[in-house]
Design a protein with these regions (language model features):
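Glycine-rich helix-loop "coupling/hinge" segments at transmembrane-helix boundaries
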Residues: 116, 192-229, 252-254
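Short cytoplasmic-facing helical segments at TM-TM junctions of multi-pass membrane proteins
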Residues: 144-182, 210
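Transmembrane alpha-helices
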Residues: 127, 131, 164-196, 236
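C-terminal transmembrane helix and the adjacent membrane-cytosol boundary/short C-terminal tail
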Residues: 89, 146, 177, 181, ...
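Transmembrane alpha-helical segments of polytopic membrane transport and secretion proteins
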Residues: 1-19, 238-254
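Periplasmic/extracellular loop-to-transmembrane helix junction in inner-membrane transport proteins
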Residues: 31-72
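Transmembrane-helix boundary motif in ABC transporter permease subunits
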Residues: 69-99, 116
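Generic hydrophobic transmembrane alpha-helix motif, especially the helices
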Residues: 100-136, 143-144
Length: 254
């Protein structure tokens, strides 16, 4: 009951903040001297979204397809790499520094190279998403595996358990919190990463749509897409939270 009350209170606070921002935005564009050309009114953004929804929705499905494919590959690869590095100290010592160093290179800098190597199709976009989503999953899972209480693994080994049983009964369950925390980051990045990749070239997608309306100075449509991307990311993160509650019912506080 207490948890539900806190959740309702948080939702009301978030909704109130959004309403305040929208009101201030409307006042600034209506009475504050801010040019509606550069910063369109909230109602104009809504109208642009509704009027151009068929076009926006077709681009949206392209972006979501790229995002989900890249997310699936990135999460799968991150899980496999984390598992292999946990099983082998040699692999951990050899590849973990490389894994960390690889994240010091901005994805925006890598994207043009991927386009040059792979063209303007779907592959460079999926590859960029994989690069962005792979790291948080791999590192979070690996840290969770390494932080498992060694006494628990020793106890299972004393009872005749092998590596499979140790992962099944100890390491995988105890790594779920880290996994879902990283998964939320990966989910939100997958959509943003797809849009960034589409900015650099492509034929369809929300990023391509944004470039086209930018050239026409249709700022109302640009804002509409920005809010759509934010909404998609929030919905996906809420979906991950829902899956987490179902996968980890013992974490629910009544």
């Amino acid at each position: 009951m207490k948890k539900k009350q806190v959740s309702i209170k948080d939702n009301i606070s978030a909704a109130s903040l959004i309403i305040i921002i929208l009101v201030l935005w409307h006042l600034a564009t209506t009475y504050g001297g801010v040019s509606a050309f550069m910063l369109p009114k909230p109602l104009d953004v809504v109208k642009a979204f509704v009027n151009d929804f068929p076009t926006i929705s077709s681009h949206m499905w392209t972006t979501l397809t790229e995002a989900f494919l890249g997310l699936f590959v990135g999460v799968s690869l991150g899980f496999i790499v984390a598992l292999l590095m946990d099983l082998s100290d040699t692999l951990y010592s050899a590849f973990y520094p490389i894994l960390v160093i690889s994240q010091t290179v901005p994805t925006v800098a890598i994207a043009p190279l991927l386009v040059l190597w792979m063209g303007y199709g779907v592959m460079p976009k999926i590859t960029l998403i994989v690069i962005g989503t792979f790291f948080p999953i791999a590192v979070s899972l690996l840290e969770a595996f390494k932080q498992v209480d060694p006494d628990k693994t020793k106890l299972l080994k004393a009872m005749g358990a092998g590596k499979y049983e140790i992962y099944k009964y100890i390491k995988f369950p105890e790594s779920l919190t880290n996994f879902f925390a990283a998964f939320k980051i990966a989910v939100s990045y997958s959509v943003v990463g797809a849009v960034i990749a589409e900015w650099l070239g492509g034929y369809k997608g929300l990023g391509v749509y944004m470039i086209r309306v930018q050239k026409n100075y249709s700022f109302d449509k640009m804002f509409a897409v920005i809010f759509l991307i934010s909404a998609i990311s929030l919905i996906l993160m809420k979906l991950v939270s829902f899956i987490q509650r179902k996968a980890m019912p013992w974490t629910e506080v009544k």
